[in-house]
Amino acid sequence: MMKNILAIQSHVVYGHAGNSAVEFPMRRLGANVWPLNTVQFSNHTQYGKWTGCVMPPSHLTEIVQGIAAIDKLHTCDAVLSGYLGSAEQGEHILGIVRQVKAANPQAKYFCDPVMGHPEKGCIVAPGVAEFHVRHGLPASDIIAPNLVELEILCEHPVNNVEEAVLAARELIAQGPQIVLVKHLAQAGYSRDRFEMLLVTADEAWHISRPLVDFGMRQPVGVGDVTSGLLLVKLLQGATLQEALEHVTAAVYEIMVTTKAMQEYELQVVAAQDRIAKPEHYFSATKL
C-alpha cells in the first residue's frame, strides 16, 4: 500500500527548502506527499533577502478541514512537520495531528523541531523553540533534532555520543518512541565526518558518512530531506538500521551530485535514481 504523508512546513518557489526539498525525494521513494505550506517565500532565507509571507495559522486548519470534508483524512498515514512560521502555527498543527489520529489511530506524527543550525544560529520566530519543548515533543511519535535542538529539548549540554544517546532517551521518556539526532556535529566521534544517531528506548544506532565540502555556503534543506526520507522508510516497514543506512546514503548522493554540478541548491531531480537506489553504502553500528 502506498503511504500518504501530510507534510506541513515551509515552501520556496525558487530552489529547495522545506516541502520544496522533500516532496520529490519522498515521492521518488514511493510515498504520496500532501504538501501544506507554513510559509511561501521566493527563496530560502540564507540568501539574505527574500519575499513572501507566513501563512495564517487558521489556513492550515482550514485546508485539513477540506480534506476531512471529502472523507480522505483517514487515508493519511503520517503528519510530518518542519519549519514553523510562528508558535501559533504549531498549536494548529497539533490540532491537525489530533484530527488525523482520530480519523486513523495508526497514523504517526513526525516532528522535525526546526529551531536552529550549528553553523547558522537560530533562525525561527519567537516562541517556536518553547513550543517544541512544551508541546511538540510530548505530542510526537518520532522527533528529529540536530545537536543544538537536542540540547534545547533536553535543556542541558550534550558533549559526546554517549550523552546524545542518554539525551535522546530523556526525550523518549516524554513522548516519542524514536529520536533521530540528525547532525551530531561536535558531539560526534570525528570532526571530519557527518554523524547521526537513531535511538529508541532499547536500541541505539550510529552512522557516519564523509562530509561534503561546499566551502562557506552549505546547501539548505539537508535536514528536511533526511527527516522526510526516514519517515517514508519507517512507514514502509524498514528496520531502524535499514532506514538509517538508506537515508544516509541517499542524502550523501544528493550532496555529491549537487557539488559535482557546482550548485548551491540541492539537486534532488538530478540525483533521483540514486535517491531510490544509492550507489554508496554506509554501515550503521549498534551501540
From Swiss-Prot:
GO biological process, one term: pyridoxal 5'-phosphate salvage
Keywords: ATP-binding, Kinase, Magnesium, Nucleotide-binding, Transferase
Catalytic activity: pyridoxal + ATP = pyridoxal 5'-phosphate + ADP + H(+)
A GO CC term attached to the entry: cytosol
GO molecular function, one term: ATP binding
Magnesium in keyword set: yes
Binding residue positions for substrate: S10, T45, Q46, D224
UniProt pathway annotation: Cofactor metabolism; pyridoxal 5'-phosphate salvage; pyridoxal 5'-phosphate from pyridoxal: step 1/1
Names of the cofactor(s): Mg(2+)
Binding locations of ATP: D112, A144, E149, K182, R209, P210, L211, V212
Family: Belongs to the pyridoxine kinase family. PdxY subfamily.
Task of the protein: Pyridoxal kinase involved in the salvage pathway of pyridoxal 5'-phosphate (PLP). Catalyzes the phosphorylation of pyridoxal to PLP.
Subunit structure: Homodimer.
Protein name: Pyridoxal kinase PdxY
